[in-house]
Structures are given as C-alpha cells and as structure tokens.
Regions:
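A conserved segment at the C-terminal end of the G1
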Residues: 152-163
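Polybasic, low-complexity intrinsically disordered segments
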Residues: 33-50
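Short glycine-/polar-rich loops that comprise or flank the Walker A/P-loop
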Residues: 175, 185, 210-214, 258-262, ...
Length: 389
C-alpha cells in the first residue's frame, strides 16, 4: 500500500482558536474583496475595499451587521439557514458603488440556492431527485472525480447503498447520500456526478458548499488520468473551489470561495503491476500535493483506512451525555470538532439548554473525574458530560 502523508492541520494552542478553524470549512479565494484579515468563519474579517464595474478600487465599508451575517453564513451547514443568512447579508450590505459586485454575487447565490431548495421540496413530494443534501453524521464528505473512476462503486462498498454502477460514463446524475460507519459514528458520504468539460453540472458547486471534505477518486489505469485530474481542478477553480491538503484558518477575501480539504483515492489499485511508479508519475506530472490512499472498490483493499483518516484529520470529537444519577448514554455520541466546548455540546442537545446552562460536570481526558466546568471548557474525544441548567 502506498504510504499516504497526513493532511496537515495547524494546531493552535488555545481552544477558542481551534473552533473557528475546524468547525467550519476553511474557505478562501482571490475573490471580490481586498485587505481582509481574520479567522475562518468571518468572525474577525475586516474587509476594506471592492472593485467597481470599471475596475476602480473603492471603499466597501461593510457594516458590523453585514459582517455578523456573513460570519453566520460561513458557519452554517444547513441549506435553509444559509439562505436566511444570505438574505440578511443582502439586506445589511451598504448599497453603493463599492459593493456592486458583492451584491450581484449574493443575489446569484440566493437564486441558485433557492432553486436547489425548491428541487428538494418537489423531490420530496413527487419522488424526484433532491439537489440539496442536508448534513448528517460526524461530517459530510463528497465523492468527486472524472468519469468512470469508480466513485459509485466505492460509495456502494463504503455505505452499502444502492448507488447505480455502470460501465458507461456519467451514470450518476444526481447526489446520492449514504452513511459510512466508523466505530460508533457515521460519516455522510455523497456520491456526485462526474466532473468533465463535456458534461457540466450547474448545481454541483452549490452542493459542495455544505461539505466538510472531499474524496477525489482517480483511476491510475486510465491513460488520460493526468488530463482528467487537471480538468477537475480547472473546472472547480473556475467556480472558486480549491481542493487542498491543508485544513487551516486563512485570511479570507471572498465569502463564497471554498477550500475543500481533500484525500485522493487511487482506485483500482488491484489492477496495477507497479502502483508506486504510477503514483510517483501522477504526482510529478500533475503537481498534486494531496494525500493519497491506494484503494480497490472491487476487493476492498485500503477502504478500512478511510474512516480513521477522516476521523483524525477532521478533528472529530465524540461526547457522551448523562443525566444526574444515571449512567452515560454510550450508544449515540454527539460529534463536535477539536476545540469545541461544553457550550457547543449544550447547543447540540437543545438551543434552550444552551441559554439556560449554568455549569457542567465532565469525566474524561479534558478534566478530572466529575470536574465542574463552565461554558468555555474544551471537550476531548470520549468525554462524558453532565449538563446542569
């Protein structure tokens, strides 16, 4: 098996610095706005200027209300909530020449997301396909790649779904969701249509917005593998989507650009005589720095390594809750990200509990047995938390 480099995660020293990094995806780009600094999620963005229609740089002077709405939009993973925050961004953005491009971009995003939400409603009522997949489980992972790379076969093998598999290209036409188990949690795996110049999918980029990471599937036995990989990166780049080996907080200029942490899966490894040589050639010719696993949907080779890799590199944290005088529920953990807190646990249980929470007791690696802690206490994987309102 090819040895895969780990996704590089820049570990901050403080709990509150990590939450913004890992709870929301790192989204960056060349974008519309300039002189922007701050954490992922827009929590500390200071956007200073924009370009007008004639190319002149003019002040944007974005208001605190707009920045708050943008921060909420970035953090949200629910499509309906993202629509609400987009509308709030449009309502609160200063209306002048310096924000013309950003206003147009927000309106386009609202239109595209509205069409997706409408398709989901019609699909639910009439049996049609939904283009919006609401995130579930520990993380939402999208399967992307060129035609006939074996995405649907991998999806079927990893989730037990009934994804349609064909020998001809473009078999997958709509998103297909399934749950991939890992220990006592599940990752939501979304099989998407292939990415190719001859078959563009207009709604694909909007579907990627709620994903936490991507699995890029390639077939090293395909002679045009390099060209296919370059085409995938180019098409996504045109839509301000970058596949990256890093999961990090980055100064963000464009609220709609997306950096998607990605693991490459070199499929059909069982058919390669010298996989190491093929993989080396792929890296050298494509310039890709993505971590790679050699896998086979046919034999199952390497598939058992995907769940542990996602769990570790996405910073998944399992927390088990208990009520006073009763044992912890060890069957259905709440899943958070490394650096999140007791307050985040309370919000997952119920929004009202988050507001009324006075303190919590914690058992596990983040404190001594039964330690009384406050809202800002960082939880660790395997912690048991008893919430007191």
């Amino acid at each position: 098996m090819v040895r895969s480099p780990s996704l590089r995660v820049d570990e901050p020293d403080q709990c509150d610095e990590t939450e913004g990094d890992l709870e929301g995806k790192a989204e960056v780009g060349s974008g519309l706005l300039g002189a922007s600094v701050g954490r992922v999620g827009g929590l500390e963005l200071h956007q200073e200027h924009n370009r007008s229609e004639d190319g002149d740089i003019v002040p944007a002077n974005l208001s605190p209300d707009y920045k708050a709405a943008e921060a909420a939009f970035r953090k949200s993973r629910d499509p309906s909530e993202r629509m609400e925050w987009l509308r709030e961004m449009l309502r609160t953005i200063p209306k002048h020449k310096g924000t013309e491009h950003l206003q147009a971009d927000i309106k386009a995003r609202i239109k595209g997301l509205a069409e997706q939400l409408e398709s989901a409603t019609k699909g639910a009522g009439h049996g049609g396909p939904a283009l919006v997949i609401r995130p579930e489980g520990a993380a939402q992972i999208v399967l992307i790649g060129p035609p006939n790379a074996g995405k649907s076969s991998l999806h079927t093998r990893l989730t037990g779904s009934a994804a349609h598999v064909g020998l001809y290209p473009f078999t997958t036409q709509y998103p297909k969701a399934g749950m991939m188990p890992h220990e006592d949690v599940h990752f939501q795996l979304i099989d998407l249509p292939p990415i190719a110049q001859e078959h563009p999918v207009p709604w694909l980029v909007n579907t990627l917005q709620t994903a936490d990471a991507a699995l890029l599937v390639v077939d090293l036995g395909e002679p045009s593998c390099i060209e296919q990989l370059q085409a995938v990166r180019s098409m996504l780049g045109q839509q301000r989507v970058t596949l990256t080996e890093r999961l990090e907080a980055t100064a963000d200029e464009d609220p709609f650009a997306l950096r998607l942490p990605t693991l490459m899966l070199a499929n059909k490894a069982d058919g390669m005589a010298d996989f190491d040589a093929e993989l080396l050639a792929l890296r050298e010719l494509s310039g890709s720095r993505l971590p790679v696993f050699a896998v086979s949907a046919a034999t199952g080779h390497g598939l058992g390594d995907i769940g542990p890799w996602l769990f570790q590199n996405l910073g998944i944290v399992r927390v088990y809750t208990k009520t006073p005088g009763h044992p912890a529920d060890k069957h259905r953990p709440f899943t958070l990200r490394r650096g999140q807190t007791v307050g985040d646990v309370a919000r997952l249980v119920h929004q009202d509990l988050a507001r009324s929470l006075r303190y919590a007791r914690v058992w596990g690696r983040s404190g001594f047995e039964g330690q009384q802690v406050g809202h800002d206490h960082c939880v660790a994987d395997g912690d048991i938390v008893e919430l007191h309102a």
